[in-house]
């Protein structure tokens, strides 16, 4: 008689009993090790996260910045900053190599994000994606789901680059990403090129959509039942997942920007990726939330009706025709997120500048 199976944590149980994969929302080495111990098989990063790692480990990275400045006397602070992002990404990617081999490219990848300031320039995005793809065999490149980003996603996919569509909040964006990926894959296949080892995903920043609903709730004196806005991202994710499954798109959805446990618990059972930051992983692992598939449990009609009835931007996010590609860049959560990511790039320039030109006062 065999004993009951034991798991290290709720997240570990999810990875062992359902198709849902765990990635870590950071390239921080200590946090990634914790995640891997609990079943993680990938990691994501963005300019805000990268800046936080560099600040946390400035004792390690300051000498490296000084070395780079000596080695590249003509380099700008921006160029040095991106060198640092590349190096910390490669460092984290090493930890994921076993998962990369085990999953044959579908998992085991480290996401590195293209410069958010390039969000309007498809050619520049692709050029940087090509460079990032060469950093390590198990890279996956984040490209924003902006108008130019959609074109870049098709081009990068055709070139064999696994992409992670980011700055994405809506069903229309996800469909545009999926169709762009399919076009890129078909172009590769028509040329006899391999596609099976590519690990493409499309992120839905579920919590950032919720955040915008809360802003609107305060700005417009809307009255809805308590907690309704916490379901916006989950509702979009579930609907999008159903459509992806019906149409057989060859990419997975990824849940990011965590604000509550439903951004994990309501999506368990999906052939998808959950990518919480370490602080949320520890909260989930300390919880008594039952680990069971809920992806096919619909969001209550009463909740969806309130979101649709009171929030025009939720209607745009929830309907396949809610946004045209020309409207992706001006959608409020897109603008808010790009502004934050671009500000982090500016702060990264400042971090390098403080080493390049220390304040003499």
Region roles according to the model:
Residues 1-30, 34:
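N- or domain-start disorder-to-order transition segments that initiate the globular core
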Residues 20-26, 41-45, 108-114, 139-143, ...:
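Hydrophobic faces of well-ordered beta-strands that scaffold small-molecule active sites
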Residues 162-294:
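Catalytic alpha/beta core domains of metabolic enzymes, predominantly
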Residues 49-51, 56-148, 152-153:
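Active-site beta->alpha loop and helix N-cap motifs at the rims of alpha/beta catalytic domains
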Residues 31-60:
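An N-terminal structural lobe/cap that precedes and organizes the functional/catalytic core
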Residues 32, 129, 150-153, 174, ...:
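Generic hydrophobic/aromatic pocket-lining and core-packing "Φ" positions
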Residues 28, 47-49, 86, 114-118, ...:
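Active-site-proximal loop/turn and secondary-structure-junction residues that shape catalytic pockets
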Residues 293-361:
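C-terminal extensions of enzymes
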């Amino acid at each position: 008689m065999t004993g009951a199976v034991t798991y290290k944590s709720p997240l570990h149980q999810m990875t062992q009993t359902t198709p849902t994969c765990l990635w870590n929302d950071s390239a921080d080495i200590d946090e990634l090790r914790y995640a891997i111990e609990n079943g993680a098989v990938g990691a994501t990063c963005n300019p805000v996260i990268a800046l936080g790692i560099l600040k946390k480990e400035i004792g390690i990275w300051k000498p490296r910045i000084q070395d780079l400045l000596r080695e590249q006397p003509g380099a700008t602070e921006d160029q040095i900053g991106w060198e640092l992002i590349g190096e910390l990404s490669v460092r984290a990617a090493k930890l994921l190599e076993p998962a990369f081999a085990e999953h044959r490219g579908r998992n085991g990848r480290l996401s590195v994000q293209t410069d958010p300031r390039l969000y309007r320039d498809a050619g520049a995005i692709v050029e940087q994606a090509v460079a990032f793809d060469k950093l390590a065999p198990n890279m996956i490149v984040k490209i924003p789901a902006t108008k130019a980003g959609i074109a870049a996603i098709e081009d990068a996919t055709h070139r064999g680059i696994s992409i992670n569509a980011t700055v994405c909040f809506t069903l229309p964006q996800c469909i545009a990403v999926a169709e762009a990926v399919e076009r890129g894959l078909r172009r590769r296949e028509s040329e006899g090129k391999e596609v099976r080892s590519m690990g493409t995903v499309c992120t839905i920043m579920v919590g950032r959509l919720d955040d915008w609903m809360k802003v609107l709730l305060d700005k417009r004196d809307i009255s809805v039942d308590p907690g309704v806005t916490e379901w916006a991202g989950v509702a979009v994710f579930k609907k999008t997942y159903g459509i992806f499954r019906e149409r057989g798109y060859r990419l997975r959805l990824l849940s990011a920007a965590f604000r509550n446990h439903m951004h994990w618990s309501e999506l368990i059972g999906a052939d998808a990726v959950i990518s919480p930051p370490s602080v949320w992983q520890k909260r989930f692992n300390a919880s008594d939330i039952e680990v069971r598939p809920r992806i096919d449990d619909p969001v209550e009609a009463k909740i969806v009706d309130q979101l649709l009835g009171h929030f025009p931007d939720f209607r745009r996010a929830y309907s396949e025709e809610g946004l045209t590609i020309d409207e992706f860049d001006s959608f409020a959560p897109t603008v808010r997120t790009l502004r934050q990511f671009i500000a982090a790039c500016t702060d990264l320039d400042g971090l390098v500048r403080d080493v390049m030109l220390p304040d003499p006062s």
